[in-house]
Amino acid sequence: MDSAKIINIILSLFLPPVAVFLARGWGTDCIVDIILTILAWFPGMLYALYIVLQD
């Protein structure tokens, strides 16, 4: 696990949309994570962790 992935994991805990943006760019995944984070922070964080760990 390199340092960029560790930083993305930490970002996914505190700023989930930023972590998804860095992992996948601006697209459907980022929009879904923004919506999940606005509705409730915890689902947005879990989705961001899923995206970051999947790559």
Swiss-Prot record:
UniProt keyword Transmembrane present: yes
Molecular-function GO terms, alphabetical: phosphatidic acid binding; phosphatidylinositol-3,5-bisphosphate binding; phosphatidylinositol-3-phosphate binding; sphingolipid binding
UniProt GO BP: monoatomic cation transport; regulation of membrane potential
N-terminal signal peptide: none
This protein's record includes keyword Zinc: no
Alphabetically ordered keywords of this record: Cell membrane, Membrane, Transmembrane, Transmembrane helix
Protein name: Plasma membrane proteolipid 3
Name of the gene this protein is made from: PMP3
